[in-house]
């Protein structure tokens, strides 16, 4: 059996993090989402076909040394259905299709070993209206698919993992683009439903469709629950390490630093002195957290620095950022209500504690503060003493004008 993983989309709801990086390559628990999916299925399949398009070079360069992986560029037409169709000339039998932006616990052996040819995996949720809803009969035959319905007939949703027989390619070739101009995989599934030829199987354990920034933090927290302590690198005097913590080779933890697990500190990171790393934090490769800085429940991506006297809480900082002294991310409203975040020009409720989403190559001056839920576009500079309470577009230069009055003292 082979597998097709859909990795071509832009991931606009995760902007600014996806302004330079494809969504499947965003880190969760210290590794890209796509790498976690591939590790799940590596022993179940013979070949893995990655359907790529947006920022494809990043994906190709990361996985180019894996002989099992082949890359197919999605051309001409957008849509998940057309993405699957791109693999037609490479696959002869049954195969898996997996969305490239999901985190899940299930090992998928039940799906692979099941005699049923066409399967959609299902997950039970409290908010089915946000997803594609699946209705099944008492034998798990799928009898209806509803796309983000206002009045869902079920709390079972499409979990984005499928098994198909080769016949699906014939159906996909007959489909016309939707109103969005895309060939949709769901339209092919509806044809299988008409034929009474597709079943649903519930996934076991955790599942998360990484569609919004706080989903990254939720999945990150879940993965960190299962880590085991593995401490390498250079550990300075009076360093306190509590709970499950992974510190990779090539790191340096300077004196009097406190690290509370679960947490992961990747190779090349320099932490301290007097830094405080709190639970559910991941510091990616070559990051820096300096004197008296505190990081809590956050992801700091590659090559980014939080040098001194700063607080980063429930936030995500992109690659190659530098936070000036006393940079603060606020993460809680006075009324304890969910933090509101702009997603594609719409205000969306996130979670109770949620900080800032900072894109790539961002610099802040001294004493910059971010209000809960703000997003900072990539390649932006935020000048000293700014309080940021609105989203900032990429390539912006934000600064504050203040009049400084200088007088001669009276004698």
UniProtKB/Swiss-Prot annotation:
Pfam families: Hexapep, NTP_transferase
UniProt superkingdom: Archaea
Catalysed reaction, written as an equation: N-acetyl-alpha-D-glucosamine 1-phosphate + UTP + H(+) = UDP-N-acetyl-alpha-D-glucosamine + diphosphate; alpha-D-glucosamine 1-phosphate + acetyl-CoA = N-acetyl-alpha-D-glucosamine 1-phosphate + CoA + H(+)
Ranges where the record places region Pyrophosphorylase: 1-204
CDD domains: LbH_G1P_TT_C_like (cd05636), NTP_transferase (cd04181)
Enzyme class (EC, first level): transferase
InterPro entries associated with the record: Bifunctiontional_GlmU_arc-type (IPR023915), GlmU-like (IPR050065), Hexapep (IPR001451), NTP_transferase_dom (IPR005835), Nucleotide-diphossugar_trans (IPR029044), Trimer_LpxA-like_sf (IPR011004)
GO biological process: UDP-N-acetylglucosamine biosynthetic process
Region (Linker): 205-224
Catalytic activity, EC: 2.7.7.23, 2.3.1.157
Keyword Transferase recorded: yes
Keyword Disulfide bond: no
Active site positions: 308
Family statement drawn from the similarity comment of this UniProt entry: In the N-terminal section; belongs to the N-acetylglucosamine-1-phosphate uridyltransferase family. In the C-terminal section; belongs to the transferase hexapeptide repeat family.
Protein name: Bifunctional protein GlmU
Species in which this protein is naturally found: Methanococcus aeolicus (strain ATCC BAA-1280 / DSM 17508 / OCM 812 / Nankai-3)
């Amino acid at each position: 059996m082979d597998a097709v993983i859909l990795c071509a989309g832009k991931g606009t709801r995760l902007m600014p993090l996806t302004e330079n990086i494809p969504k499947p390559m965003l880190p969760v628990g210290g590794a890209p989402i796509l790498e976690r999916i591939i590790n799940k299925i590596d022993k179940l399949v013979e070949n893995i076909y990655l359907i790529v398009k947006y920022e494809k070079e990043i994906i190709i360069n990361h996985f180019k040394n894996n002989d099992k992986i082949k890359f197919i560029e999605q051309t001409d037409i957008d849509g998940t259905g057309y993405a699957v169709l791109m693999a037609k000339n490479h696959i002869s039998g049954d195969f898996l299709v997996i969305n490239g932006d999901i985190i899940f616990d299930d090992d998928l052996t039940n799906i692979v070993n099941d005699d049923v040819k066409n399967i959609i995996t299902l997950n039970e949720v409290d908010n089915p209206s946000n997803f594609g809803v699946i209705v099944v009969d008492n034998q798990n035959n799928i009898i209806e698919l509803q796309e983000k319905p206002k009045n869902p007939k079920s709390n079972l949703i499409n979990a984005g993992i499928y098994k198909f027989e080769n016949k699906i390619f014939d159906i996909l070739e007959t489909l016309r683009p939707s109103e969005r101009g895309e060939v949709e995989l769901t339209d092919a599934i509806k044809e299988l439903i008409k034929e009474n030829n597709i079943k649903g199987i519930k996934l076991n354990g955790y599942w998360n469709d990484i569609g919004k920034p706080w989903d990254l933090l939720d999945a990150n927290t879940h993965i960190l629950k299962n880590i085991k302590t593995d401490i390498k690198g250079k550990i300075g005097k009076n360093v306190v390490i509590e709970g499950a913590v992974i510190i990779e080779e090539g790191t340096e933890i300077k004196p009097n630093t406190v690290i509370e697990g679960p947490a992961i500190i990747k190779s090349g990171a320099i932490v301290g002195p007097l830094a405080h790393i709190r639970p559910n934090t991941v510091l990616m490769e070559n990051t820096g957290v300096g004197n008296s800085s505190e990081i809590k429940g956050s992801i700091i991506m590659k090559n980014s620095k939080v040098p001194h006297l700063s607080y980063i809480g429930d936030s995500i900082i992109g690659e190659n950022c530098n936070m000036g002294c006393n940079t603060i991310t606020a993460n809680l409203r006075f009324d304890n209500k969910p933090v509101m975040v702009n997603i594609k020009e719409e205000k969306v409720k996130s979670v109770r504690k949620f900080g800032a989403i900072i894109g790539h190559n961002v610099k802040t001056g001294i004493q910059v503060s971010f209000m809960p839920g703000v997003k900072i576009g990539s390649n932006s500079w935020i000048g000293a003493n700014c309080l940021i309470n609105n989203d900032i577009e990429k390539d912006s230069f934000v600064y504050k004008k203040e009049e400084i009055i200088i007088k001669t003292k009276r004698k």
